[in-house]
């Protein structure tokens, strides 16, 4: 069971369930739903469909409000619903400090007089402004599956390769030969970092596959500072070693010299048992997205 003080990993499945909780809390007398781009568009469109109301999009960066199209079923015949005269429900995914919330209130408040703010998640410690309605309390730090490498923690995150950056190698591809090389070249991306370079990748792939591995990263626009590959000469030789200990050792060496800001330093590992072992050895935060588990 998850302790309340334990950082959470929110999967997309969990997110959908929590959006469902929000649907039960929103007022039905609103004239229009406003989604905050980009993070709030998923819950906002669900709320708009649920309430059968038109939707508009609020851009935090440009301060603009855009119509999202209402579909032919909305509005009475061809009379267009004018959100500006009515009650607006603003929807976003999370409020952590309340800073973004304050900006959005400024943008929306200029154009609409009657506004209700709702988010799926809210940090109980948000000090700059909380929404009027939220479905779930979510403390900091936490990871969102859809925002894994786009958060402020990214700069302090070391990662495993297969099963995180790309889908795992299937057993029949693992021949340490042509099939495996084909897998490395054509692996399907999974969680791709776009915001900033990954400080450290530690992979069980062996050193001789460095060139195609780096080529794959470049092709998918992934930037990284350090890529550590297994020193074994063959995958058979590697199988005799303790891969979790190898990852833990390299993670720890980097973590000791890394200054987290805002922190915490963590490792993202695709395999549950390895993740648990890396956490045990290093006593640091390790996340396994596949099982939505966080060791702290």
Model-identified regions with their sequence ranges:
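Hydrophobic anchor at the start of a short beta-strand
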Residues: 55, 88, 114-116, 199, ...
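Short active-site oxyanion
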Residues: 29-33, 198-201, 262-266
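PRPP-associated nucleotide enzymes
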Residues: 1-158, 166-187, 215, 219
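Acidic di-acidic motifs
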Residues: 92-93, 160-162, 267-272
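Helix N-cap/beta->alpha junction signal
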Residues: 37-40, 206, 271-272
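Short loop/turn segments at strand-loop or loop-helix junctions that form parts
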Residues: 159-171, 229-233, 291
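Substrate-recognition element of Asp-dependent hydrolases with the DxDx(T/V) motif
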Residues: 191-214, 228
């Amino acid at each position: 069971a998850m302790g309340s003080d334990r950082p959470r990993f929110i999967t997309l499945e969990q997110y959908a369930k929590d959006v469902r909780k929000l649907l039960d809390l929103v007022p039905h007398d609103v004239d229009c739903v406003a989604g905050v781009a980009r993070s709030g568009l998923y819950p906002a469109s669900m709320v708009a469909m649920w309430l059968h109301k038109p939707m508009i999009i609020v851009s935090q960066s440009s301060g603009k409000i855009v119509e999202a199209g209402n579909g032919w079923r909305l509005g009475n015949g061809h009379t267009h619903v004018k959100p500006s005269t009515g009650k607006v429900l603003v929807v976003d995914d999370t409020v952590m400090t309340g800073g973004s919330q304050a900006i959005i209130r400024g943008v929306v408040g200029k154009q609409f007089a009657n506004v209700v703010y709702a988010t799926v998640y809210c940090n109980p410690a948000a000090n700059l402004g909380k929404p009027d309605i939220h479905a779930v309390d979510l403390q900091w730090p936490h990871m969102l599956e859809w925002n894994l490498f786009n958060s402020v923690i990214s700069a302090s995150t070391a990662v495993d390769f297969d099963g995180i950056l790309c889908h795992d190698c299937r057993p029949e591809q693992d021949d340490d030969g042509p099939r495996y090389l084909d897998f490395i070249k054509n692996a399907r991306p999974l969680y791709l970092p776009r915001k900033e370079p990954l400080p450290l990748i530690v992979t069980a792939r062996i050193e001789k596959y460095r060139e195609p591995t780096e080529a794959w990263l470049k092709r998918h626009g992934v930037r990284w500072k350090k890529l550590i590959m297994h020193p074994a000469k063959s995958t058979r030789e590697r199988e005799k070693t303790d891969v979790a200990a190898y990852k833990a050792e390299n993670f720890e060496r980097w973590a000791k010299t890394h200054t987290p800001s805002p922190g915490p330093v963590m490792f993202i590992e695709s395999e549950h048992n390895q993740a648990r072992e890396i956490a045990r050895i290093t006593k640091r935060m390790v996340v396994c997205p596949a099982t939505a588990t966080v060791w702290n």
